[in-house]
Amino acid sequence: SRRQRQMCIRDRDQTSKLSKRNGDASFEDIVAKGYLPEAVVNFIALLGWAPKGEEEIFSLEELVENFDISGISKSPAIFDPVKLKAVNAAHIRRMTPEVFLEHVTPYIRQTVKRQDIDLPLLASVLQPRTELFNDVPEMVDFIDKLPEYDITMYCHKKMKTNEETSLKALKAVLPVLEKLEDWNTESIHKALFGLIAELEVKNGWLLWPVRTAVSGKQFTPGGGVELCDILGKEDALARIRRGIEKLS
């Protein structure tokens, strides 16, 4: 005879059952927010089932292979949106670069219209930092146009930077990058870290101002080196010059 088990799923506050009647999200609603269908299935499986080993991230095929009814819990399952996002991020990390590029490109193109952008390069920077595809358009919205930003963004306690030190850093960086003939992540990294060694300063003292100048954002999908490469030499240098103007 076939046995059936039904799980009760509660919201994170543990006070009420999830219900479409109460406006709780369906599978389709969650996927529409940028979650991968296989990540949602993985998360739902973990709500009331404990795998035998330490691994919690499974493809659909791996779930079929590993699922055992003996691992199902009798206790009500808790719907934790933080855990859902973590599971989704883990599935994104598992993607091959080619598959991730295919998935992420439409989200990039919502805000990045420039045709000179190296999409595989941008995708390689985004993949380890993306938790949710719907976050991507805002993550890359500085690429087409440098947003207006306040110079207080150059102040970073941990990096020990302020407006004065950032101006010094950008003035030191500009001629070094201007001289670069080969413009790529490796050459930019070598040039900037060579300058860091020459000036005998901490990495962040130099790199935080560069990242701020080229992005105009507090949080970016990558550091100053990667962003300079993505933007291209002409645009990156123009943004650094703009940073110098703002700080002067």
Question: In which residue ranges do the predicted regions lie?
Answer:
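Single conserved hydrophobic/aromatic residue that forms the stacking wall/gate
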Residues: 1-9
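Conserved phosphate-binding loops in nucleotide/dinucleotide-binding enzymes
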Residues: 11-43, 47-56, 65-94, 221-231, ...
